Design a protein with these regions (language model features):
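N-terminal flexible/basic segments that precede or flank functional cores
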Residues: 1-19, 82-100
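Residue-level signal for the short linker/turn that defines the boundary of a DNA-recognition helix
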Residues: 22, 32-33, 59
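Short alpha-helical DNA-recognition segment
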Residues: 33-50
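Conserved beta-strand edge residues that scaffold enzyme active sites
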Residues: 42, 81-82
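DNA major-groove recognition helix of helix-turn-helix/homeodomain DNA-binding modules
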Residues: 62-78
């Protein structure tokens, strides 16, 4: 089965559940994993992954981190005062990777 690839959010700042949902979906589709396969890889129920990719509330932080880790999505913590600097640096690194 071919999985339609989606792209990561253009802004690395996770401002909502929907932004994180888009990143998880992008990681899964770029790995050519179906939702069922990704749920197996992440060791979570399929419905949990469905809820995450839909941006639904109610998924525990532990499960969300488990899914993100299994799919290779990294989350970073930075003080709000450094948000724009960190955002800019991550975008620069991401853009440099696009040129390779």
């Amino acid at each position: 089965m071919t999985v339609k690839r989606t792209s990561f959010p253009s802004d690395p700042f996770v401002s909502s559940a929907n932004v994180l949902a888009k990143a998880v979906r992008a990681a899964r589709t770029q790995a050519q994993l179906t939702m069922a396969d990704a749920a197996l890889v992440a060791n979570v129920a399929l419905q949990t992954l469905v809820d995450v990719e839909a941006g639904r509330a109610g998924v525990s932080l532990a499960k969300l981190l488990q899914i993100a880790d299994a799919l290779g999505v990294s989350l970073f913590v930075a003080p709000a005062a450094l948000r724009e600097e960190v955002r800019s640096q991550i975008q620069d690194i991401t853009n440099a990777g696009d040129d390779v």
